[in-house]
């Protein structure tokens, strides 16, 4: 089926009862609410585009009062001929205060995960210390201290 067109794979009746949708963007991005019912689209840095994003957490990582982004992803569930989405190892993006985001090197951020992340969740312990839990597909979650 790899060399066939979509018209050769499906009969006309399938198309007649199908809902057609169009994607305007194929990159990882944020939509910024302008407050008047409109949104401004902003692509995320190129390092984020290396793999899919499956989990995002908004936290002020560096204590400057602006929400930064922590992201993780990967998808290993594709058929072998399509390969895996596994080129990123998690992303930390620091907010410059004007919604400009700068990617942080893994050594600087301390956030490096080769696994297939399905969800990110931040939480505090009873003393108020912040942590990030990464839910890993078919594995134990990983927990990172955010205040160290």
Segments (PLM) and residue ranges:
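Beta-propeller-forming repeat regions
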Residues: 1-148
